[in-house]
Design a protein with these regions (language model features):
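C-terminal, charged and often intrinsically disordered regions of DNA end-processing helicases
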Residues: 1-42, 272-281
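Hydrophobic (often cysteine-bearing) scaffold residues that line and stabilize catalytic clefts
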Residues: 40, 44, 99, 103, ...
Length: 281
């Protein structure tokens, strides 16, 4: 379940990739714990993911499109009752209706991609925690793990955003390699990992092997060493990219005339606790 709490400070796939793109953005989210306001995109993603999790909690024969749309409506009503202010994300009723229709279409599209009545997942929204041989703590909330009769594992991650072009597919697979490493440390290397893009009905498949995941583990170690150096010197550099246009903490970035807050010592200590402890910390 997504509401399961990690047992210790650890790196996630999204935050690790975030550091590689922009150390300052990573710092503000992980060290300072700056919370960004919800957006239409994050609201849609959260609601759709919860719906698919609830779908697989049903008996196999009940997992049909009609009932899935009812689950979606229930999940949305629960979200709205808990926080009516989410309606402020929409400019008017027409804007909300367009958003709501996109959400419905993603659930319908899911049934064109997979038959949930033919599947019996090993887990949904599972919190997986592990420590690498280098002593780096990792975690991931994995949308779905399937297990074949022969024991082979398949990792599924639902995506409500746009499918990447071939040029950017390797970056999208960072998360799948991260999850493959997690499972290799806790269960066994998955036979297959898939990113399921609900809007376009595209599926990006990656079949990991031990050599690839070993190289990825080494990449994580190098990234961790860079994080650690930044933490010890108390400086995480901003890095300009086209993604700056969508950055939720840009007002705190010096590249955009923002003021970066003083770095909290407690946050640095929490970050350093994600890796092996050394005498120079």
């Amino acid at each position: 379940m997504r509401n399961s709490l990690p047992s210790r400070p650890a790196l996630s796939a999204s935050r690790t990739k975030e550091y590689q793109r922009c150390p300052l953005q990573f710092r503000l989210h992980v060290v300072d714990r700056v919370k960004e306001p919800p957006t239409q995109a994050t609201l849609l993603g959260t609601t759709v993911h919860a719906t698919l999790e609830n779908l697989y909690a049903l008996p196999r024969e009940e997992r049909n499109e009609t009932l899935a749309l009812e689950l979606l409506r229930t999940e949305w009503e629960k979200t709205l009752a808990a926080d009516p202010s989410v309606m402020n994300l929409f400019t008017d009723h027409a804007d909300f209706e367009r958003w709501h229709e996109r959400m419905n279409s993603m659930i319908k599209n899911y049934f064109a991609i997979e038959d949930p009545q033919a599947l019996e997942p090993l887990s949904t929204e599972a919190l997986v925690e592990a420590t690498t041989s280098q002593g780096i703590n990792l975690l991931g909330y994995i949308d779905r793990i399937d297990q074949a009769p022969n024991g082979a594992l398949r990792v599924i991650d639902y995506k409500t955003g746009k499918a990447p072009s071939p040029r950017f597919q390797e970056e999208a697979l960072f998360q799948m390699r991260f999850y493959a490493l997690l499972l290799s440390l806790t269960k066994r290397l998955p036979k297959r990992t898939q990113l399921v893009y609900l809007a376009s009905q595209k599926v990006l498949t990656f079949d990991p092997d031990s050599a690839d995941i070993s190289r990825f583990s080494e990449e994580l170690s190098r990234t961790w060493e860079s994080m650690r150096r930044d933490a010890l010197q108390g400086y995480f550099a901003p890095r300009r990219s086209p993604l700056c246009n969508w950055c939720g903490v840009r007002t705190m970035c010096p590249l955009f005339d923002g003021t970066t807050p003083e770095i909290p010592t407690s946050g640095l200590e929490r970050l350093l606790a994600m890796g092996p402890q050394r005498s120079d910390q």
